[in-house]
Amino acid sequence: MAIEDVLRAGNYHLIDVREPLELEMDGHIEEAQNIPLGELEDRKQEITNLSGTKIFFCRSGNRSGKATEYFKSEGLTDVYNGGGYNDLRTVLDNL
């Protein structure tokens, strides 16, 4: 499923796995929750408890891919790699 379809379906949570300094330097998506990649394991229950699709994104899509694979390996099926910040921002702006 394309990211546009996931976003149009609604009922999702955007999770930005970049470091806080990256958000300050590069910008952020207002509705996104910032949980750096290094904190995901400690905050697993918090993320697991979110209803709907969890869309991870980062600067380029690499860390969000790791986050997506981690949660899939933990048994979650409602996770999606949203890719890089700039690309996701463009998609959101054009919906």
Predicted regions, residues:
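Short, surface-exposed ligand- or partner-binding patches at beta-edge/loop junctions that are enriched
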Residues: 57-58
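Rhodanese-like catalytic fold shared by cysteine-dependent sulfurtransferases
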Residues: 2-12, 17-54, 64-95
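Conserved G/P- and acidic residue-centered "switch" motifs that form tight phosphate/ATP-binding loops
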Residues: 61
